[in-house]
């Protein structure tokens, strides 16, 4: 269980920034030295990812109900916690569970990864990203991306 997403490193040539650096290569050099400032919207989205990871740890990674409840009480004190966010995350987790069960129906040998760092250096030097949920079973690969927050429209 990793959970602290706010201190993650960011790749210079990230997958999420590919539209910009592919269409405007000079932007890579131009952005060097500029601090990566977060916004409340990004922080809220990061919190949603951390909360979803807590749920996945309970469902798939052996976190006990006691440990979940204790951690969840701490999450409820976070400035970004709201019932709306909790409901959104629970809906996302339910969707992932549905996809996981579909994968099990194809093949009992399911690979499921949650909030996993992906090395993309083979394709773009020094590039990496995070796979929110990756499910592989019976020759089918599903990549599920959590989008939460406000302020900037994101296409996924």
Residues covered by each model-derived region:
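Mg2+/Mn2+-dependent nuclease catalytic core
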Residues: 106-156
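Accessory terminal regions of nucleic-acid processing enzymes
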Residues: 1, 53, 57, 153
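Generic start-of-chain signal for non-secretory N-termini
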Residues: 1-11
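Nuclease catalytic cores
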Residues: 10-60
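A non-catalytic, helix-rich entry segment at domain boundaries
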Residues: 43, 47-121
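General structural signal for secondary-structure boundaries
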Residues: 11-15, 81-86, 154
């Amino acid at each position: 269980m990793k959970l602290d997403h706010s201190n993650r490193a960011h790749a210079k040539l990230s997958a999420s920034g590919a539209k910009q650096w592919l269409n405007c290569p000079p932007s890579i050099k131009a952005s060097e030295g500029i601090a990566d400032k977060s916004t409340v919207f990004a922080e809220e989205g990061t919190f949603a990812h951390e909360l979803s990871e807590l749920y996945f740890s309970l469902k798939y990674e052996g976190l006990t109900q006691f440990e979940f409840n204790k951690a969840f009480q701490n999450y409820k004190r976070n400035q970004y916690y709201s019932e709306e966010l909790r409901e959104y995350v629970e809906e996302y987790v339910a969707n992932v569970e549905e996809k996981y069960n579909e994968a099990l129906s194809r093949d009992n040998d399911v690979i499921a990864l949650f909030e996993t760092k992906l090395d993309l250096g083979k394709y773009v030097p020094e590039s990496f990203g995070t796979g929110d949920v990756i499910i592989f079973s019976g020759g089918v690969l599903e990549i599920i991306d959590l989008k939460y927050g406000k302020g900037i429209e994101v296409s996924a």
